């Protein structure tokens, strides 16, 4: 089996067979247990090299904020992006057959945990003293067999998973998603049994916000599988293996249809700023209503004004979700101030009707 795997370690173009698998779901859904079992089975049955990259291990809770508290959401986002950069360093080394060098401007704790994670799975060789060796050698399994890297995290927003897809597309890798579907009550129960449980409110909020893979809406999510957390049958195992094989044998093309890509990027762009837009628009509507009250607009007119402003806000947010109309651009980044500016122009038109009724 391993001999066959070694023979099939490269594609027709000479590039190594590489795949990225996003394993997502709520905290305590059983992702880490599933990932370990999957990796063990693929090594034994397929002869593949498999690396499980658990974000909980590589982005530890021990990364404190400056005042000793846990990192803010903006810091977590920075750490996640840094981890993807480290992953890219490893992928480049595998593809080129070169040594992997430590990147500049790194968070040392994240880098060391990342390297340790690879070493523990026989994907990397390096001395005990990390600082004594700036370059790290790939272990033989990483270059002599098909290699699948399983990224184990909540990935509850579509935009988080899309960043991994972009990395796979950049280097023409296989890509797939496994969503572990577990009842919220079960996750809460398991979480409560952990030595360091998350607050129940955090998991409940994530349960409301989590975005399952949607291949019908997003073409890039077509290699996705939703698995019930209790499903451990042979049929489920074969289905998962089939998905991984399909991804490995059909890597993403580096160059895709530009129109489709612009549309996809626009939707992702809206997802990234949706929460900030919601908060800012709420404050803007509240401030406008206070100003209207100061102008002594009649109560009945205030009611209608509030209805119109809230409808306008809802329309803007829905546009951000759906990726249509004028509030979105075709760039990878959308300036929130542009969205607020567009909203305020329409708000002023609405408000003017009620102010003019006063005079």
Curated annotation (Swiss-Prot):
State which pathway it belongs to.
Aminoacyl-tRNA biosynthesis; selenocysteinyl-tRNA(Sec) biosynthesis; selenocysteinyl-tRNA(Sec) from L-seryl-tRNA(Sec) (archaeal/eukaryal route): step 1/2
Which Pfam families does this chain map to? KTI12
Keywords, A to Z? ATP-binding, Kinase, Magnesium, Nucleotide-binding, Protein biosynthesis, Transferase
EC class: transferase
State the EC number(s).
Answer: 2.7.1.164
Q: Tell me which domain of life the UniProt entry assigns to the organism this sequence originates from.
A: Eukaryota
| Reactions performed catalytically | L-seryl-tRNA(Sec) + ATP = O-phospho-L-seryl-tRNA(Sec) + ADP
Any one GO MF annotation of this record: L-seryl-tRNA(Sec) kinase activity
Q: What is this protein called?
A: L-seryl-tRNA(Sec) kinase
From which organism does this entry originate?
Mus musculus
């Amino acid at each position: 089996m391993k001999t066959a795997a070694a023979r099939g370690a490269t594609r027709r173009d000479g590039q190594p067979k590489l795949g990225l698998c996003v394993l997502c779901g709520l905290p305590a859904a059983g992702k880490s247990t599933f990932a370990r079992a999957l990796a063990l089975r693929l090594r034994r049955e397929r002869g593949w090299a498999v690396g499980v990259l658990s974000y909980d291990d590589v982005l530890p809770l021990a990364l404190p904020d400056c005042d000793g508290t846990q990192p803010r959401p903006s810091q977590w986002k920075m750490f996640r992006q840094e981890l993807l950069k480290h992953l890219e360093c490893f992928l480049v080394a595998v593809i080129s057959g070169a040594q992997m060098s430590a990147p500049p401007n790194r968070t040392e704790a994240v880098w060391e945990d990342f390297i340790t994670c690879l070493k523990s799975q026989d994907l990397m060789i390096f001395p005990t003293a990390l600082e004594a060796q700036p370059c790290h050698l790939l272990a033989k399994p990483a270059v002599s067999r098909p290699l699948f890297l399983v990224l184990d995290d909540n990935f509850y927003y579509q935009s988080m998973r899309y960043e991994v897809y972009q990395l796979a597309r950049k280097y023409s890798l296989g890509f797939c998603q496994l969503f572990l579907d577990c009842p919220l009550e079960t996750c809460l129960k398991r979480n409560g049994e952990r030595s360091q449980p998350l607050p129940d409110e955090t998991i409940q909020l994530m349960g409301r916000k989590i975005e399952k893979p949607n291949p019908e809406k997003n073409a890039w999510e077509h290699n996705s599988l939703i698995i019930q957390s209790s499903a451990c049958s042979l049929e489920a195992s074969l289905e998962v293996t089939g998905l991984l094989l399909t991804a490995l044998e059909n890597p993403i093309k580096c160059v895709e249809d530009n129109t489709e890509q612009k549309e996809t990027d626009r939707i992702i762009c809206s997802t990234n700023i949706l929460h900030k837009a919601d908060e800012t628009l709420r404050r803007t509507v509240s401030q406008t209503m206070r100003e209207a009250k100061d102008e002594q607009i009649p109560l009945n007119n205030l009611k209608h004004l509030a209805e119109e402003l809230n409808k306008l806000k809802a329309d803007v947010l829905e546009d951000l979700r759906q990726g249509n109309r004028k509030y979105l651009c075709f760039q990878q980044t959308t300036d929130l101030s542009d969205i607020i500016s567009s909203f305020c122009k329409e708000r002023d038109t609405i408000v003017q009707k009620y102010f003019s009724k006063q005079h």
